[in-house]
Amino acid sequence: MSPQTETKASVGFKAGVKDYKLTYYTPEYETKDTDILAAFRVTPQPGVPPEEAGAAVAAESSTGTWTTVWTDGLTSLDRYKGRCYHIEPVAGEENQYICYVAYPLDLFEEGSVTNMFTSIVGNVFGFKALRALRLEDLRIPTAYVKTFQGPPHGIQVERDKLNKYGRPLLGCTIKPKLGLSAKNYGRAVYECLRGGLDFTKDDENVNSQPFMRWRDRFLFCAEAIYKSQAETGEIKGHYLNATAGTCEEMMKRAIFARELGVPIVMHDYLTGGFTANTSLAHYCRDNGLLLHIHRAMHAVIDRQKNHGIHFRVLAKALRMSGGDHIHSGTVVGKLEGERDITLGFVDLLRDDFIEKDRSRGIYFTQDWVSLPGVLPVASGGIHVWHMPALTEIFGDDSVLQFGGGTLGHPWGNAPGAVANRVALEACVQARNEGRDLAREGNEIIREACKWSPELAAACEVWKEIKFEFQAMDTL
């Protein structure tokens, strides 16, 4: 029997190409509590109407393709298709629109950030009808949130593990980031922890290079942790970077860290990938390890205002995939971060319920139900003069991380750590006494300098250092 080559009109299938908006633009649609909602910033090519552009995004990120196909008739597109349900122009921008798309929950595998992103931010970002496309925000329904473990432990459990309350945690990234031997690296870790820091950190690109193999680093850092704990009576930690070329090697490093009895490991979640990150987060919960997350590569994805993925989406994805800390920008340091927008996604990381607030870039109300919170990490170009602002901006549930601002102290690493700890304790005490950190911050630091020569020396070195550039990440 030869295959059928002709189609009769009565079959109901009409081959060819039709406008996306005929199927995927549905302004009358009422969103469901179970829908994943997305806000895209869409820049259509000249001559492409916004309705067609928004519908194309909905189609290409869900069930659509460039032409009608026979197999459309074998399923229910009304049940599974994405829908562009609202479009609004972007104020102050020509030919840019916020297009809202609703996705049925059945399109996504449970507990998989990888699958969710493969659909929503997949091939559609290379679509020719669009000049540029940026995912500004996602609303994750509670039905989907509950399919994720999320952070291995969360903020309160971490505080209980560390026995540290009522203040931000203090950290330091060991510098130079590359080139130190394992023994010298461990020495720097010890000096910083002995001086008063809670944590030290592997830089994100420290994995297992010829000058310092991972096992040697882990051993010397563990020795530094135990020695500093014995001398200070405080629980200490070092973010041992378990990121590796394969998931198997990553897990081997995490297992060795657990065997050493250290409290925390680290992962570069964007370069390492969401599948690897989620696997590591599950291991960390099962084995009592905290998980510090670095966002290396994020600016490639999120820095351009009209194309890519906003970091608030990457932050939500991390909370779902799993991490106890994540770098979030500083507002005041050397790296990108506008205050209101930064605090918007900081709240998305920490709080259980966040109301829609467009002034802070939050497009949807988000309910995290029982998913634990994540500590934001302020890191990058910060020093003791920034301490009042950081304490006021980020509050107690944060990690303030000074790399060069510790190791660059003129008297050495331990005095650098002392200076940061004294500055933090002074700011917390002043705040608790009702003083205004934003207005009196410099005075508070100067007062503390009178009884801390280490802090006075740090203040003298960095008194003129500022990073005053306009933020790219604006509303």
Curated annotation (Swiss-Prot):
Source species, domain of life? Eukaryota
Which residues are the active-site ones?
A: 175 (proton acceptor), 294 (proton acceptor)
Enumerate the catalysed reactions: 2 (2R)-3-phosphoglycerate + 2 H(+) = D-ribulose 1,5-bisphosphate + CO2 + H2O; D-ribulose 1,5-bisphosphate + O2 = 2-phosphoglycolate + (2R)-3-phosphoglycerate + 2 H(+)
Cofactor comment: Binds 1 Mg(2+) ion per subunit.
Q: What class of enzyme is it?
A: lyase
Question: Which GO terms fall under molecular function for this chain's record?
Answer: magnesium ion binding; monooxygenase activity; ribulose-bisphosphate carboxylase activity
Its subcellular locations are: Plastid, Chloroplast
One short Pfam name that applies is RuBisCO_large
Q: Which InterPro entries match?
A: RuBisCO, RuBisCo_large_chain_AS, RuBisCO_lsu_C, RuBisCO_lsu_C_sf, RuBisCO_lsu_fd_N, RuBisCO_lsu_N_sf, RuBisCO_lsuI
Please indicate if the UniProt record lists Isomerase as a keyword: no
Miscellaneous comment as given in the Swiss-Prot or TrEMBL entry: The basic functional RuBisCO is composed of a large chain homodimer in a 'head-to-tail' conformation. In form I RuBisCO this homodimer is arranged in a barrel-like tetramer with the small subunits forming a tetrameric 'cap' on each end of the 'barrel'.
Q: Indicate the family of this protein.
A: Belongs to the RuBisCO large chain family. Type I subfamily.
PANTHER family in UniProt: RIBULOSE BISPHOSPHATE CARBOXYLASE (PTHR42704), RIBULOSE BISPHOSPHATE CARBOXYLASE LARGE CHAIN (PTHR42704:SF15)
Protein purpose: RuBisCO catalyzes two reactions: the carboxylation of D-ribulose 1,5-bisphosphate, the primary event in carbon dioxide fixation, as well as the oxidative fragmentation of the pentose substrate in the photorespiration process. Both reactions occur simultaneously and in competition at the same active site.
Protein name, UniProt field? Ribulose bisphosphate carboxylase large chain
